[in-house]
């Protein structure tokens, strides 16, 4: 294939498909992390292309916290049914027994127990040696320096000072017993690339990405959508209707919406062309402390 004859989106697509096929061929028990967002939707689409007309040779894994938006759960179940994928859902039983929730315990503890520990439990339970993730280098500074093949020790920890060179699309997947890797096929994509590809390929996405009037409360400079009756209103807070959408999706009490008029994919793309802020400005977990994402990844976060 002559890469010079491809558009930049087709080059990114080809690179991602190559990575997905490499991992499927090289590792004994891979899995694709499925968090239901736009990046997961693109990654799943690429994986289906990589093995078409066959089925995916690995399952999807959703590490569930119990606090995703209702529309995300509906979209997940619809997608799995439509494509005939094998879906594994894991929720940290210890966290459930402790009653961990983001309102009472805060974003850091909730993320550590329900996401990081939940992910490590699932990887250990099924013995996965490679896990695909939809992270991109343009999202956050610690992800910017992470390799496509991100090696983890037997405790699932990442050491940014111990990464392997990746030259000319050659990847060294040699691991010792108990070790594993996280694989990021979308590393070189940008947020704009993702939206342009979704539009080009007509990929279905969670409706929360499109602007519409929604019930929100303003808290700590963020617009939190009231998704169910578990909302813990603080003194003086009032639920109001605002036309908002989400640039990134996570647990609804920890994910801020943005005011927007973008009701269609072309409108989102136009909005991205003039945006000067990071999509992760709406993630409360990134505000826990300086370097919080790198710390979480060192502890086993994806």
Swiss-Prot record:
Pathway: Sulfur metabolism; hydrogen sulfide biosynthesis; sulfite from sulfate: step 1/3. Its EC number is 2.7.7.4. Transmembrane segments: none annotated. Pfam families: PAPS_reduct (PF01507). One of its GO terms (biological process) is sulfate assimilation. One of its GO terms (molecular function) is ATP binding. InterPro entries: PAPS_reduct_dom (IPR002500), Rossmann-like_a/b/a_fold (IPR014729), SO4_adenylTrfase_ssu (IPR011784), Sulfate_adenylyltrnsfr_sub2 (IPR050128). It catalyses: sulfate + ATP + H(+) = adenosine 5'-phosphosulfate + diphosphate. It is an enzyme of class 2 (transferase). The keyword Cell cycle does not apply. It comes from the Bacteria. Gene3D superfamilies: HUPs. With CysN forms the ATP sulfurylase (ATPS) that catalyzes the adenylation of sulfate producing adenosine 5'-phosphosulfate (APS) and diphosphate, the first enzymatic step in sulfur assimilation pathway. APS synthesis involves the formation of a high-energy phosphoric-sulfuric acid anhydride bond driven by GTP hydrolysis by CysN coupled to ATP hydrolysis by CysD. NCBIfam families: CysD, PRK05253.1, PRK12563.1. Heterodimer composed of CysD, the smaller subunit, and CysN. Belongs to the PAPS reductase family. CysD subfamily. This is Sulfate adenylyltransferase subunit 2. It comes from Yersinia pestis. The gene is cysD.
């Amino acid at each position: 294939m002559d890469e010079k004859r491809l558009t930049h989106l087709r080059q990114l697509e080809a690179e991602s498909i190559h990575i997905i096929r490499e991992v499927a061929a090289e590792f004994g028990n891979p899995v694709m992390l499925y968090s239901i967002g736009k990046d997961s939707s693109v990654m799943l689409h690429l994986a289906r292309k990589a093995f078409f007309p066959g089925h995916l040779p690995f399952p999807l894994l959703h590490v569930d916290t119990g606090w995703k938006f209702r529309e995300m759960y509906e979209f997940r179940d619809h997608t799995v049914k439509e494509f005939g994928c094998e879906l594994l859902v894991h929720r940290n039983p210890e966290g459930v027994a402790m009653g961990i929730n983001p309102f009472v315990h805060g974003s850091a503890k909730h993320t550590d127990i329900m996401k990081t520990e939940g992910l490590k439990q699932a990887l250990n339970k099924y013995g996965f040696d490679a896990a695909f993730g939809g992270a991109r280098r343009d999202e956050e500074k610690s992800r910017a320096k992470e390799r496509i093949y991100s090696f983890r020790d037997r405790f699932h920890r990442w050491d940014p000072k111990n990464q392997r060179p990746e030259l000319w699309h050659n990847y060294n997947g040699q691991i010792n017993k108990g070790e594993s890797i996280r694989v990021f096929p979308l590393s070189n994509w940008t947020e704009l690339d993702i939206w342009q590809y979704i539009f080009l390929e007509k990929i279905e996405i969670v409706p929360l990405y499109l602007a519409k009037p929604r019930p929100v409360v303003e808290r700590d400079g963020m617009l939190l959508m009231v998704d169910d009756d578990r909302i813990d209103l603080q003194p003086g807070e009032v639920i109001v209707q605002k036309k908002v959408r989400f640039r990134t999706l996570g647990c609804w009490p920890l994910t801020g919406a943005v005011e927007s008029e973008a009701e269609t994919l072309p409108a989102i793309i136009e909005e991205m062309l003039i945006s000067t802020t990071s999509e992760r400005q709406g993630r409360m977990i990134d505000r826990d402390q300086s370097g919080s994402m790198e710390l979480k990844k060192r502890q086993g976060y994806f």
